[in-house]
Regions:
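N-terminal low-complexity, Pro/Thr-rich disordered segments
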Residues: 30-51
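A short beta-strand-turn-helix
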Residues: 47-64
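Structural alpha/beta surface segment adjacent to cysteine/selenocysteine redox centers
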Residues: 62, 70-154
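Conserved S/T- and glycine-rich ATP-binding loop of Class I adenylate-forming
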Residues: 66, 74, 198
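Generic structural signal for beta-strand residues in well-ordered domains
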Residues: 59, 67, 91-93, 160, ...
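C-terminal cap of thioredoxin/glutaredoxin-like
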Residues: 1-34, 85, 157-221
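Glycine-centered flexibility sites
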Residues: 58, 96, 126, 187, ...
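Conserved short-loop catalytic and cofactor-binding motifs
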Residues: 54, 106, 119, 140, ...
Length: 221
């Protein structure tokens, strides 16, 4: 009886610790967004020197493509960007084995739409992933005013080579509208109902859904 009770206590303690860690990560994002200057995503250093084409990260001729569906206000996307993406980039993208295409969605609200448009507009300058990482690193509370044209200008100004004025002018550009429509269509076709979601397959071929839990083994396979 004592052994069983100890097991229950240990399991409860582990669950509580996991909840505390997750809450700490999510709360910390809102606090960073209120700081004086933009924080830096761990992924930012990882993507340095890797080719970007619009919303794609990695060599165009990489044999495999990972479609990543994300919302700039999704806290779990931000956690994935911070904890999982750097390792994937280092192991698969930088060596030229994988290309990641961001499929932006705006599930959460109007600030999701504004932030996504900014990422796509930055992508017209091949800086989309740099801005995406920066937004995740400075993610605030959902639709609480952390994403405005003013804050986006500040974020953009901290990225070398990104023209903030041009980015803001392109928020409603035809290319941005086209990318928005393409991502919505791809998400609908793939049955995507939440973020982050993933599809993996040969570059130029059909991509298949893969769960976040299975992504690591699928990439290694």
């Amino acid at each position: 009886m004592r052994v069983n009770l100890l097991g229950v206590v240990v399991a409860a303690a582990a669950a509580l610790a996991g909840a505390v860690i997750a809450a700490s990560l999510l709360t910390g994002r809102g606090q960073r967004a209120a700081s004086d200057g933009p924080g830096v995503s761990p992924a930012a250093a990882e993507i340095g020197g890797i080719p970007q084409q619009g919303i794609a990260l990695g060599a165009p001729d990489a044999p495999r493509t990972l479609a990543y569906y994300g919302d700039v206000q999704c806290p779990y996307c931000a956690i994935w960007d911070e904890s999982d993406l750097p390792g994937i980039v280092d192991e698969y993208v930088r060596p030229g084995e994988l290309r990641i295409v961001f499929r932006g969605l705006a599930f959460i609200g109007p600030e999701s739409d504004l932030g996504l448009r900014a990422v796509l507009a930055a992508g017209l300058q091949d800086q989309g992933w740099n801005l995406l990482n920066l937004l995740y690193a400075n993610q605030g509370h959902e639709n609480a005013g952390w994403l405005t044209e003013s804050s986006l200008r500040r974020f953009a100004a901290s990225i070398p080579g990104l023209d903030a004025d041009r980015m803001l002018a392109d928020l409603n550009a035809a290319e941005v509208e086209s990318e928005l429509a393409d991502s919505r269509a791809a998400a609908q076709a793939g049955g995507v109902e939440g973020t982050p979601s993933f599809e993996l397959g040969p570059t130029g071929g059909a991509l298949s859904p893969v769960s976040q839990e299975e992504l690591e083994s699928a990439l290694a396979g």
